[in-house]
Amino acid sequence: ATQDSFLSVVLKYRCQILFTTRSNLNEYCTFQLKEIQDINILFQLTSAFYSEADKYRSTVEKIIETVHYHTFAVELAAKLLENGISTPGQLLAKLQEERASRDNEDKIKIIKDGQSSKATYYSHIHTLFSLYALSRKQQDIMCNLCFLPYTGISARIFAKWLELPTLNEINDLIETGFVQTTTRHTISLHPMIKEIALSETKPSVSSCHILLDSLQKICLMHGMEVAYYKKLFQTIGNIIELIEKDDIPKYLLFLENAFPYMDNYNHHKGMNGIIQELTGLLKTKNIGTDSDRALLLDFQATLETKPEKAIKLEKDALAQIETITADNARLVSNLHANLGGLYRMNGHPDLAREHM
């Protein structure tokens, strides 16, 4: 990864102790500082900046939990309560709604790295994590990292999904502290970093098309299994929840290709999530095609436990397509095969032969 231009200069000062966000200083004796998980200690930190902390202790503790025990965020929240017009209850509600509270316009003063500045609470969080200083490529990586499960995924697998030629950019993000990693080279985002990255990069179908295309290719490899399928499905679930749907046709195709692959693993939670998403989207008449609506009914039939209802759903799916064309012929053939299979399984061989 790229080295900071000032690091070698700083090291020449023969520092006894150097505090840094770098995590790759193998040639030195290092001690990793992690978040303080003891809420009593963080409450003491809050009390140092907020004079009425004891009066509102239960609410203050909820604020600490909401900002994920991040000490700088706790300090900012305390100063905002001391100097602003928000009550603890109001601030908690706003944090729970927007986490990194963009709308709170109360100005507070903070000193970080010897520099004094005034900004809103949200701007301070951005200043701390310096998202604006990232290169465009690194911002794109952060944008796509938002979809990873909290448990993370292999850095090499993720790099392959994004078609990155090397791990250099990811390693840079690890060294600056934006990306968390383990000894097994699993990468993930801290929850608060994820929230800020989501707000700042605004992941969309069009901006994350490389990731979606890569996941879709995996899902189209019928008969081929991947060892990390659980993390794959968690990533798809996060995409459904978080992505901006600015290219509906591409997004529908992504969902429709993911569903059968989940079916191979009997991943009913993910399958139900896709059905719910498609149902919501296709309620709008000008969204989707007859084939999209037929596929939705076919997916619903796949998870239906009652044979009669499953058969009706497959019939309804076929009824969606009035004219068979080159574009929908394969779908119609599959729908007939599925309906025939249901008839055969339920003791109707004559009806089954009509469709198989």
What are these regions (language model features)?
Residues S207-L295, K309:
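Extended alpha-helical scaffolding segments used for macromolecular assembly and cargo binding
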